[in-house]
């Protein structure tokens, strides 16, 4: 059964909106960041990673965001161009704002942390005037990142994009993507997260992220009840993630589908979520069954946590298919199916 319909006449498949950053991942593995001397530089930020992931899978991808007017901004735009992502609506900060920097600390295969520099960042300079109705209308779906709602004028730009998407039969995907930086209070988080969630066709987040979204409305911390609440506003699919325990997609007909992580040689404890999101959305667009969409997303996540980078390691559709095939041959057909 199809739970969501896309307008296939629209030329672009997805337009992610929000944060673009630079990731510095250590090549000195499994030591504190204070002792690391060598790092590799990658394009980062969840919406940017998802954009790259979708493009690698063969989707036609645009982007709405703001980057710094310097060499780091050039690096991002050039990288997007190389990946085939449309950059016509990636703007440049006008007052010296910097691109966000993320340094990762990989202490072990299980323990990782992230050090973010988010003061005076360019991505929060995205202005409502940068959101063009014709561009929004050209996409089958937009992907709004919760981080972009943390500060004005970026949050108003996202809300404008959401309203224009509603007006133009464009599906709205809300990737909650919580980062504690910049938010002033849990009430502020709940106000803006819930506003987008009430208008979304698909909501993707961890249990913690759904709890933050529901902070004011008072939904109990129960996955099924959470899904039913947001589906009462019109959401078709709610995907609630539980890390190592797997994830479940709740559909608006009362059904649910659960997937587990694929076995993987783990290198780091982060990066899987963006691969999961891009592969899940790609599979939905392809018309796959929900359980197959989850399986494709889970496989992509396992590929990502086995790699040093996020954006650079985003797999092609064939790489994900080969990974699933090899995993099932090794561990059995139901390796990731709960």
Predicted regions and their residues:
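Structural alpha-helical scaffold elements that stabilize or flank donor/cofactor-binding regions
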Residues: 134-135, 195-196, 231
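Conserved phosphate-binding/catalytic region of the ribokinase-like
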Residues: 1-14, 163, 215-338
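Conserved N-terminal subdomain of the carbohydrate kinase-like
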Residues: 60, 64-144, 321-338
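Glycine-rich phosphate/adenosyl-contacting loop at the front of the ribokinase-like
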Residues: 2-86, 265-267, 334-338
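Short, conserved phosphate/pyrophosphate- and ester-handling motifs at nucleotide-, phospho-/glycolipid
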Residues: 54, 206, 273
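Conserved beta-alpha-beta core of the PfkB/ribokinase-like small-molecule kinase fold
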Residues: 141, 147-228, 245-246
